[in-house]
Amino acid sequence: MVRIGLLGCGNVGRIIATHQDGFTVEALFDRLPDHAEELARMCGAPAYADFQEFISQDFDICVEAASVLAVREYAPKILENGKHVLILSVGALSDTNFRKILLDVARSQGKKIHIPSGAIMGLDNLKVGGISRIDSVLLRTTKSPASLGMQVSHRTLAFRGKANECIKQFPKNINVSVALALAVHHDVDVELWADPEVDRNIHDIFVSGEFGEASIRVVNHPSPDNPATSYLAALSVLSLLKNLDSPLVIGS
């Protein structure tokens, strides 16, 4: 059974901690201690107000469900303390210098950095970009204006550009673009739309390359209590954790 420490006790953290299947939650940490203590009462795992005390506990992998800033602050320390790390706020890895530092630490410690599929599907197949030519990648994401902190009366283009620039402007909303870029080993063109007519998050992905062409549409229900996050993102973490201890692993 995989033992995890949970860094981040907000909405996604609550979903993870209350759906333990194939793993157990051994420790909780949040920069807001009240959040960790509340989740501790729900799932029975101990909460820690001090990060060093948290990371010293006996678990195999630390699951980050907090923020891009939390990844930058804590991910290197997690690896240095001999833990694998699962990063949900993958937007932090859009910084190439930080990504290199993190990979160097992981190699030196013999540990893994796990990136879940998050709010989209198809990443497993699109990893062929690491061994085969990719010509173009477009991600068109549509969300409610409220989830983007906008007030508009009609469908409005909030951003058009590259993934590494989009994540700077919307660090809580478009982590999926960075996960896609890492998977396909290619720049991702991003269109982010605010649409008052939608109540779900929509991701349209268009990829062409040596393998052929792929078009993927994912229409997600927002995560409970947080319209900025897709419920599928939390479920993808649960799936990854369950697979870590499974004798049968499907996909590359």
Curated annotation (Swiss-Prot):
Keywords: NAD, NADP, Oxidoreductase, Pyridine nucleotide biosynthesis. It catalyses: L-aspartate + NADP(+) + H2O = oxaloacetate + NH4(+) + NADPH + H(+); L-aspartate + NAD(+) + H2O = oxaloacetate + NH4(+) + NADH + H(+). It is an enzyme of class 1 (oxidoreductase). Pfam families: Asp_DH_C, NAD_binding_3. Its EC number is 1.4.1.21. Pathway: Cofactor biosynthesis; NAD(+) biosynthesis; iminoaspartate from L-aspartate (dehydrogenase route): step 1/1. It comes from the Archaea. The keyword RNA-binding does not apply. The active site is at H203. GO terms for biological process: NAD biosynthetic process. GO terms for molecular function: aspartate dehydrogenase activity; NAD binding; NADP binding; oxidoreductase activity, acting on the CH-NH2 group of donors, NAD or NADP as acceptor. InterPro entries: Asp/hSer_DH_NAD-bd, Asp_DH, Asp_DH_arc, Asp_DH_prok, L-Asp_DH, NAD(P)-bd_dom_sf. NAD(+) binds at A119, N175. Belongs to the L-aspartate dehydrogenase family. The iminoaspartate product is unstable in aqueous solution and can decompose to oxaloacetate and ammonia. Specifically catalyzes the NAD or NADP-dependent dehydrogenation of L-aspartate to iminoaspartate. This is L-aspartate dehydrogenase. The gene is nadX.
